[in-house]
């Protein structure tokens, strides 16, 4: 039975070494970014968000070393890119108990916040309560956690949801794995969602509700899907990229010569987006 207090993908976390430099990189790709946020001291992190509907992309950097950001620092020692993926939690405390009954020792719930300057100048707070599956449980090399938004109106701000590149929502998260079926089965157990075998040996795992799916495939299979895109910087195991539903006419204009046509998609190679392949497809 699927988890009751955890629904589909909420956001993806792109770990970056230089937060402000990364923000400029993603602005050049045609994204609208939130003002820079600083999380509660025990988190030791700062971020920019790229708000879509109903999900988003978070650029996250470590500002101060803390116990809670040790896994993120270990990831950054190797590379940049998507380090973890959040599910939407209806109730983080109840969700943590749900996974406990399934044999996973949750980390948290953890409460934190960050100040938000609203478009009208008011200074408010975005408040969250999260819990994580155990760090060792990382299907496809990616950690997963769940995020309960206590103040959605300070996160999904309409002015931040309009992007020059036409981006609208996440459609798929691409996870490279030498053994896609094994990694997909791991995630399926963790979230109680059945995988769907594809003809080429890749596996789709729905995240829940109408949210983006996970697609597990080998790096070789990924290369066959996007043959004209340089993928050498991507790992053999880990999150390779994001498929984003968009207005492709706007995408083409925003990316210009930096966009690579591949079939019906327009791609930004990992080298241009902090180690994350971006695949824009028609919304």
Predicted regions, residues:
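Glyoxalase I/VOC metalloenzyme domain signal
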Residues: 2-9, 14-33, 52-111, 118-283
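Conserved beta-strand edge residues that scaffold enzyme active sites
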Residues: 40, 113-114
């Amino acid at each position: 039975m699927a988890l009751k207090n955890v629904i589909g993908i909420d956001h993806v976390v792109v770990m970056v070494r230089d937060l402000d430099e990364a923000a400029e990189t993603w602005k050049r790709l045609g994204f609208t970014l939130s003002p820079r946020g600083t999380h509660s001291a025990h988190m030791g992190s700062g971020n920019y968000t790229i708000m879509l509907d109903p999900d988003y992309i978070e650029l996250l950097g470590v500002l101060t070393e803390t116990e809670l950001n040790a896994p993120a620092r270990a990831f950054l020692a190797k590379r940049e890119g998507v380090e973890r993926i959040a599910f939407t939690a209806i109730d983080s405390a109840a969700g943590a108990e749900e996974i406990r009954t399934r044999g996973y020792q949750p980390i948290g719930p953890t409460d934190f916040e960050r100040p938000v300057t609203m478009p009208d100048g008011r200074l408010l707070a975005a408040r969250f309560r999260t819990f994580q599956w155990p760090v060792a449980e990382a299907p496809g090399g990616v950690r997963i956690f769940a995020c309960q938004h206590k103040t959605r109106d300070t996160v999904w701000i309409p002015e931040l949801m309009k992007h020059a590149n036409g981006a609208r929502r996440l459609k798929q998260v691409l996870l490279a794995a030498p053994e896609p079926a094994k990694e997909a089965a791991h995630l399926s157990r963790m979230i109680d969602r059945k995988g769907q075998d594809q003809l080429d040996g890749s596996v789709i795992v729905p995240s829940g509700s109408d949210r983006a799916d996970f697609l597990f495939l080998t790096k070789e299979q990924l290369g066959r899907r996007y043959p004209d895109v340089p993928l050498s910087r991507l790992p053999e195991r880990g999150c390779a990229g994001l498929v984003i539903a968009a207005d492709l006419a706007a995408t083409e204009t925003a990316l210009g010569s930096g966009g690579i046509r591949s079939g019906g998609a327009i791609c930004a190679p990992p080298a241009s987006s902090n180690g994350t392949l971006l695949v824009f497809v028609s919304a």
